[in-house]
Amino acid sequence: FPRPPGYDPRRFALLARYLREAERRGMTLGMKQMMIVSPMPNQKTDINNSGPISTDYIGGSWNYPEADYATREKIWNEHVHYVQGFLYFLANDPAVPDRLRNEINEWGLAKDEFTDTNHWPHQLYVREARRMIGENVMVQADLQTHRTKSDSIGMGSYNSDSHHVQRIPTPEGTVVNEGDMQVPVRPYEISYSAMTPKAEECENLLVPVCFSASHVAYSSLRMEPQYMIFGHAAGLAAAQAIHSHVPVQQIDIPKLQEKLRAQNAV
């Protein structure tokens, strides 16, 4: 893993303390304790965050939703530099136990991937950003206790899944990660009104991705299958609104649902 521009090992002082304490307690930390390593074809892997200090730049995205494009680019680059520095630290810093450091150095960037961006992915994975506050904001209860909807356009079933959102220092001199949740849900219905604006604000807009949902609800709804469900319904609803000369908030919901069923929507 190459040394990133502006690399400063002090940025990973907490990681060094964590590794030192793990050694003191007799814990054996390997690569799979530092990150999720999912095998892929051709001896490659897909990695993801795992453990208290990993590939997530905790708290670094806090200002992203309200930021202008220049600030978003800066936040984007900060995430890139964090991940690059994290891997470089594990592969090179003397604070890392030899066993772990040697294991990390058995891996590297895939030489045939992302060749025009120095083998790093082209795009930041943005789980959440700015969302509409419309006619109906879906919340945790809509996933767990109020799972049926009269204006349902489809179903969701993915866990409420959020990584940590902040790291809080304590008076005792430690830190606490906050925000991680992995809560199973039973299949629930998705409300059409979650993607319609308030009627007094706009009558000809449907929002199938940045729809109205709380952080907890969006942690399940944000998956690509749900985006496709919203998009399918949005297309049919837009056509109906145009042909019927009505605002999107006043379309015939049973007629929309009938069309969706006829097109094998669930």
Predicted regions and their residues:
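Flavin (FAD/FMN)-binding glycine-rich loop and adjacent Rossmann-like elements that form
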Residues: 1-266
